[in-house]
């Protein structure tokens, strides 16, 4: 699909360049049935307000060509402020592995959620539709009436629900 309405337009451009560059570097796609190949997933995140992009390349094993691939994308897309190699060498269909290799100065992007600055790492849960999440969190805050109460945000990912109530709790 050349155009996906569920993602920012720039993701299609980055993906096309990712495929072109990886093909030129002879990086092969991972085959789940044979457990052969390098590239498992391309995972992109974009801050709704900041415009910052995180590039996460999920691989079966780290090879030098992955850094070259990342460097070329970083050169072409200044919006990419975070580039991470995630190594998943297990025979599983789970997307992310345990090992992360950070190729930039940070492993996260910054954005704003409900007037709070948040840092979003590749493994952190974060709502993909920021305006809808802000409306949902506002309704949850109205319902919870956190005025003067202690708010526990358990199993929270990036912590945005608790942060959205912090000013009134």
Could you describe each region identified by the protein language model?
Residues 1-169:
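Accessory RNA-recognition modules of RNA-modification enzymes
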């Amino acid at each position: 699909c050349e155009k996906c309405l569920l993602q920012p337009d720039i993701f299609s451009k980055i993906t096309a360049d990712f495929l072109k560059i990886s093909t030129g570097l002879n990086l092969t796609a991972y085959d789940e049935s044979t457990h052969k190949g390098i590239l498992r997933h391309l995972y992109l995140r974009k801050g709704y307000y900041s415009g910052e992009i995180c590039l996460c390349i999920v691989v079966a094993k780290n090879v030098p060509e992955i850094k070259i691939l990342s460097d070329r994308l970083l050169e072409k897309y200044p919006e990419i402020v975070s580039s991470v190699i995630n190594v998943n060498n297990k025979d599983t269909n789970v997307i992310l592995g345990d090992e992360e290799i950070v190729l930039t100065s940070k492993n996260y992007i910054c954005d704003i959620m409900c007037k709070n600055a948040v840092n979003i790492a590749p493994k952190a849960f974060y709502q993909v539709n920021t305006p809808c999440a802000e409306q949902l969190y506002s309704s949850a805050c109205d319902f919870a009436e956190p005025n003067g109460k202690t708010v526990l945000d358990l199993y929270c990912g990036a912590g945005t629900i608790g942060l959205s109530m912090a000013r009134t709790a």
